[in-house]
């Protein structure tokens, strides 16, 4: 995944794929600045401190996530690596003037898996809104089918063997400055106006989405 690279041997904070104000009015520049420049950066910085001098230091980010998953001894490494990966994936799941109709290949799978594109969007929104506490809602590919899954805290569908296509961050820091406790408003606006269905379609059938 291009969301993170190794550099002597640290994991780098990826550049945002758009300007900080590009997602307004759904996500303000203020929220994006704090979310990316403080929260995401902290996960990357903490991870680099944790892996320095360990076998993880020579691994790409996705491999760290998979190697540390389920290990109590490496819980801190997993949490920070997964959050770094999840956030990089989240930024690419959004785009200015997004939403709308998905590409044909993705639409066919949405129709086959959920009955319609609208039904898929509704299930994704429901999952995101109903996730208890912090976490993520994901559109994933599982074999020939698409599914909606929720993960708590830092967890990722990669730990469950599914292929992520698109994600929504429902940690409060993703929306609280703009929406306070109105998570549903954030989720619905994101799906309607920012969802990057082209990115989701690009990830179909790929082992390492990018």
Q: Where are the language model's segments positioned?
A:
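Feature for soluble, non-membrane regions of globular proteins
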Residues: 1-210
